[in-house]
Amino acid sequence: MKPLSSPLQQYWQTVVERLPELLAEESLSAQAKSVLTFSDFVQDSVIAHPEWLTELESQPPQADEWQHYSVWLQEALSNVSDEAGLMRELRLFRRRIMVRIAWAQTLALVTEESILQQLSYLAETLIVAARDWLYDACCREWGTPCNAQGEAQPLLILGMGKLGGGELNFSSDIDLIFAWPEHGCTQGGRRELDNAQFFTRMGQRLIKVLDQPTQDGFVYRVDMRLRPFGESGPLVLSFAALEDYYQEQGRDWERYAMVKARIMGDSEGVYANELRAMLRPFVFRRYIDFSVIQSLRNMKGMIAREVRRRGLTDNIKLGAGGIREIEFIVQVFQLIRGGREPLLQSRSLLPTLSAIAALHLLSENDAEQLRVAYLFLRRLENLLQSINDEQTQTLPSDELNRARLAWAMDFADWPQLTGALTAHMTNVRRVFNELIGDDESETQEESLSEQWRELWQDALQEDDTTPVLAHLSEDDRKQVLTMIADFRKELDKRTIGPRGRQVLDHLMPHLLSDVCAREDAAVTLSRITALLVGIVTRTTYLELLSEFPAALKHLISLCAASPMIASQLARYPLLLDELLDPNTLYQPTATDAYRDELRQYLLRVPEDDEEQQLEALRQFKQAQLLRIAAADIAGTLPVMKVSDHLTWLAEAMIDAVVQQAWGQMVARYGKPNHLNEREGRGFAVVGYGKLGGWELGYSSDLDLIFLHDCPMDAMTDGEREIDGRQFYLRLAQRIMHLFSTRTSSGILYEVDARLRPSGAAGMLVTSAEAFADYQKNEAWTWEHQALVRARVVYGDPQLTAHFDAVRREIMTLPREGKTLQTEVREMREKMRAHLGNKHRNRFDIKADEGGITDIEFITQYLVLRYAHEKPKLTRWSDNVRILELLAQNDIMEEQEAMALTRAYTTLRDELHHLALQELPGHVSEDCFTAERDLVRASWQKWLVEE
């Protein structure tokens, strides 16, 4: 059992002051202290009934004790002689068992599924016992209700909602519907009543027995509004009246509610089977029924409006991604396909969710994420309610209850709990939107002209004329018509169901009206149809674009601006979800928040599911790349900020990959034993090149080297003991594998580790001492140049400090100016001969004379040349800040440094935009002449003339 957090330990002293002498602190177990600190409801209950605590300590709650509820309750009711006694015993029994459930739940003695089962069965036991006692009492008073054949007629109770599904909350009201089988009259009583009168009176007394507050509290708040005609309808209906109502007037929301309906008590009797058979055709249609989506969407819209109207913030049931949305997701499939798939006719959510996955209606990943989210949310909800036995789904705002929930949910503090909660609810919302979406787009009347429908549906030939394309050139008009015709032919080759074609027929006129209004219609349409070809068999994505006009507009504008984005969306259509929220689409994650967002994103994936972990990493990266590119296109991110975001994203990925690899290696071999007396992992990842210099582009690979500080004699401490240095080698190999494994979402990054000591011939991971020795005694000048742009991107503080010291020492070595100048210049000339532009009359922005690499070589040369005299030059690893340092330390004139900085950022900006256009990094020879002349002059000054 986890110790109480500091705030709860302080609160325990307040609890001690409330406890009677009979419950002295020294007599209480650690478990009792924890539960009493967590729940005021349990506190109040055991103060009033100390024997309950004794019972809990001697007979702790068990997962299967719900099987004994009925026997225990019958014993409690055995001496009850009147209604007041019945009410008292029901309330005391309910409170005693709820204390036991709260105890088990708080200490996590049983699973959440078991808690839900116990809560539901307790309610059913109390309802049925009350009904049976009252039925006997009413029969003694008014006679037994019978049908025309003289057969006794029972009261059947339908438990609705979570009660029916076996998923009741800790503090829940109960939704009931009362019914009796056949008309008739009472027999054997002092006066005759017809059955409707008998069951109405009995129903009223049953509600009073359960619902009316007394000095002992109440059993359950009873809600009868789900019955036919609601509050204006009869309290109890005959089977015939129920059947007439649901056949003639039953509404979609009532179908939705009836999915979970369960007969309380004897569910296998003749009348129970008759009622169940009567209701099934109303709930589960024989045909696949897609109409329910709009009905559920309307219901969700009503709930969303109520949430806004009542200001229900932080509501884990009704809020976006909350419990209600998971229920909606599951019941969409039940209502659409339940009539054809018996597996989907379960009342309980979790078995139905498993059936949905087994039938491949949702991906296993989505289904598992929903399952985990549901159990997380239900545990949080039940814990929240068990604090005061209060019906609430709103997260607390006070520090005490936040500390209670964080502790009980096994989190260090409230921010960690809310971080995990956000991750779960975000994932639920994603699946919900894919299936159901919002109701707003459907409330707007269709306004497209018939001409756009004709353009899509009539398959016009390229020589046909249509007024909607009149603004395009002849060539563009023919291209557009040809592309539409080709796209339709491609669709004929695909397996697209009726729903998919229906959605396409709704989507395409909208899409064409937006695309063809553009001057670049032909280019944009070619990019979007390539994307659509990839998703036409996945109706969910088509529906997303069809039902969210804003998402469609973002798609069109982004694809028009960048073929790179169009290609990315075509390869990974999951990214289409990102189009739903322009607030996040055009505003990338804060640079210092990538690690935290990624951590939250990965919480939705089981830690031991390596395949899904790899997918999640790649999907997160792609979504973030899309946001960065969208902001770049929109002009909200300058080039320096684009690279900052790409670099922070890469660092977050490196951190997550190392964490995964480390966990896998430690699970297999244990930790190297030299770590036992220190913090950290004795491991560092050093970024070189663009990563080290904060200058990553959209398709940049990562130049990495791996360092460790493991002694020669270290071994791992696991069952499969291996040499400590071998452990770090396997760790580095595992990291490379996690980066390069190709999944359905591609690879994470290309990683180049050849900058390590001795290059490809050297060990993949190097000891810190060997790295320092190599740099001092064997490294070439070009390797010292590379060190200028190197920095630790992952590593414990000791190893980071060691690397920084080695880097500073190497860079501040005294060097003979002429020799250094010659070596740097010759290396640049070799590179230019090997990598320079092979295209005549073109300028390679990076590799040609006057380009980016020349600027990088100038800064590297000057750092190596003057750092011995000016050690501050070693501070930064990026070119822009190095140029600032050169000016600040009087090595380079400020005007020259600023001019080189402008040239450098201008050229890099062009490279970014060429990447967005999927174009190579060369331009016309007459481009950037001023920048190139400036760089050439600086090169001549520093690397030729001195």
UniProtKB/Swiss-Prot annotation:
This is Bifunctional glutamine synthetase adenylyltransferase/adenylyl-removing enzyme. SUPFAM superfamilies: Nucleotidyltransferase, Nucleotidyltransferase substrate binding subunit/domain. Residues 449-946 are annotated as: Adenylyl transferase. Its EC number is 2.7.7.89, 2.7.7.42. One of its GO terms (cellular component) is cytosol. Its cofactor is Mg(2+). HAMAP family: GlnE. Involved in the regulation of glutamine synthetase GlnA, a key enzyme in the process to assimilate ammonia. When cellular nitrogen levels are high, the C-terminal adenylyl transferase (AT) inactivates GlnA by covalent transfer of an adenylyl group from ATP to specific tyrosine residue of GlnA, thus reducing its activity. Conversely, when nitrogen levels are low, the N-terminal adenylyl removase (AR) activates GlnA by removing the adenylyl group by phosphorolysis, increasing its activity. Residues 1-440 are annotated as: Adenylyl removase.
